[in-house]
C-alpha cells in the first residue's frame, strides 16, 4: 500500500 498512490503490494 503506497500512501497517496495506487495501492502497491508492500514487499
Curated annotation (Swiss-Prot):
One of its GO terms (cellular component) is extracellular region. InterPro entries: Periviscerokinin. It is found in: Secreted. This is Periviscerokinin-2. Keywords: Amidation, Neuropeptide, Secreted. The keyword Secreted applies. The lineage of its organism: Eukaryota, Metazoa, Ecdysozoa, Arthropoda, Hexapoda. Belongs to the periviscerokinin family. Mediates visceral muscle contractile activity (myotropic activity). GO terms for biological process: neuropeptide signaling pathway. It comes from Bisanthe pulchripennis (Praying mantis). The keyword Secreted applies. The modification Valine amide is found at residue 11. According to PubMed:19808072, a longer form of this peptide exists.
Amino acid at each position: 500500500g503506497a500512501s497517496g498512490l495506487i495501492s502497491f503490494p508492500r514487499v
